[in-house]
Amino acid sequence: MDYPSKDVEFVTTGMFIIDEIEFDGGKKIKDIIGGAGSFALIGARLWTSEPESQQLGMIVDKGSDFPQVILDELNDLHTGIVYRETPWRKTTYGYNRLRDNGFRLFEYLTPKKPIRAPDLLETGLIYAKTIHIITNPKTFVSVCEELAKYGNLKNRPKIVWEPTPESCLPENWHILQKALKYCDIFSPNEVDSANLLGIDISESKSRAKEFVSAFQEFQIGHDSQGWVVLRNGSDGCLIGACTSSTNATSDAVVPVREILHLPSVQMKNGSVLDTTGAGNAFCGAAILEYYRTGNIIEACAKATVAASFVIQQHGLPAHTKNSEGIDLWNGESVFQRLKEYYEFLASHEASAIKELTKRGV
């Protein structure tokens, strides 16, 4: 079935998965929305009110066993999700074993159904202005070449690329260099970066700036105007421009070879429950806000705030509205949390961040 072309501001090629989570002690919870695509979409949705939220796209393949409770939760987001009926198969389910120390073991319970460029073409999502892609370097290049074949790269969409953990190996260093030319934001986490560089992951947090410096040496983006945004867990993120770039934000500049640090949102004790999907939400928010503002610092600040909502529960943050019809997530306004985050940055961080807060963004 072909779908009509849509006016799409954001799309993710990440998958939709329904998670089952088992904890130490044997407790289980089921029917939890998961998958990189779901979290990337919510990262974008947090910064997009209705009706504009209908321009945020994702493909959800509904198997014969798709739960109504999941459909209701997805529909409550009021996005441009495209549902494909696939009654001959089971919906993609995942099993998660979550240990008390935070370690997570994941495996698929039913076959996965990856999303590629032909799927975006079929569903009318191909001409999105921003695209979130999570895959290995070789497939990333292939997807981007397919996008070019279908005509989207002529429109120069903004692309954020998350490399998959299993592909972050030293032997993929060469293809990584080719892949980076296609993305506007390259966003690995600190562990993936260490694995790519052949460095013990026990040193990943302490050497994160070294990783950014290594990635900066490559051409990022078709015109070397791209960014490395390394996600460093509870330590926030690091932002670096391609070294051949003359990149500058509108008022706040990240000079070539300078690496800018943005801390994570300061969370209340006991408010962090599950960090799954935080990186995906970060990337979804980052690419959309970079497209909208042209300011990598502002985009990453908003992405950091988006991630903070994802870690407060298993699955997606709870969506409600206040008496004025404003979106609330876990009972809070995303804009209020951003305001508090900027206030924290103004008192704790470098002059570039203080300059950003002076602008009132």
From Swiss-Prot:
Q: GO MF annotations for this entry? A: phosphotransferase activity, alcohol group as acceptor
Q: Which Gene3D superfamilies match?
A: 3.40.1190.20
Q: By its UniProt entry, which PANTHER family does this protein fall under?
A: PROTEIN MAK32
- Please give the name of this protein: Uncharacterized protein C16C9.01c
Q: Which organism is it from?
A: Schizosaccharomyces pombe (strain 972 / ATCC 24843)
Q: What is the lineage of its organism?
A: Eukaryota, Fungi, Dikarya, Ascomycota, Taphrinomycotina
